[in-house]
Amino acid sequence: PAKLPLNEAIDEYIVHLKGENSWILGRFIIPISQFKDLEEFLPLFDSLGPLRLSVLGGGGKTDDEYLNNIKQNIADINDFREKHSGKIEIDVIECKLATNTPSKSIMQKATDLLNENDLKHFHEFAELPYVGIDYSTELDETNWDSEVVSTVAMISKMDNAGIKLRCGGIVKDAFPSVEKVAAMIQACSLNKIPMKFTAGLHHPLRHFEE
């Protein structure tokens, strides 16, 4: 659905909701910036129950900008919740970090705000560094441990938090290497933090030679 126009994505989602395999269907994922576009389709769910949403937010170039974006995201979410009470449920937000090494105090403030507003949260790294092991010393000679592992460990201490890993897209950098995927799974497993994968299904190949 992510590569379809919103009306087609909604139509397809409803078809699957009415199908025999609806039990496996997750939340409909949408950027917060598209809330207004979504409104016209909400009556389609009157007979299906509330539309369950996972929303995309966060981002920014600095920690302070990230926190301000989170505050605005929460305000927009609560406005949408109030306006369409009983028709939608928003209980998950996926947030892109501003940097790979965010301030602990900023992250604590952001996650506290998200928790206070009944939102589980998955955090996506700004840009994953290269994973490289020197097999003679078994040491990682890159920034993976100092940036990614330390940040995963920090976020794992925060309530209702998870890690998001992008696994596909239309550019080369959107495809993590096998080593990055394995290292991220290991980091999340060791720190006992939930993780989710995204984008791998609708963009399995970044280029077609046509």
Where are these regions (language model features)?
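Catalytic alpha/beta core domains of metabolic enzymes, predominantly
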Residues: 160-210
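Structural recognition of alpha->loop->beta junctions
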Residues: 81-89, 155-158, 190-193
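Active-site glycine- and acidic-residue-rich loops that bind
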Residues: 102-103, 130-145, 171-180
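Extended repeat-based interaction scaffolds and adjacent low-complexity, acidic/S/T/P-biased segments
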Residues: 146, 153-160
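Alpha/beta catalytic barrel-like cores
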Residues: 1-105, 113-126, 139-144
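Short, structured patches in soluble enzyme cores that scaffold and shape functional sites
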Residues: 97-99, 128, 133-137, 165-169, ...
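Noncatalytic carbohydrate-binding groove/subsite architecture in carbohydrate-active enzymes
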Residues: 110, 125-136, 150-151
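Alpha-helical scaffolding segments of alpha/beta enzyme cores, especially the outer helices
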Residues: 79, 109-112, 150-154, 179-190
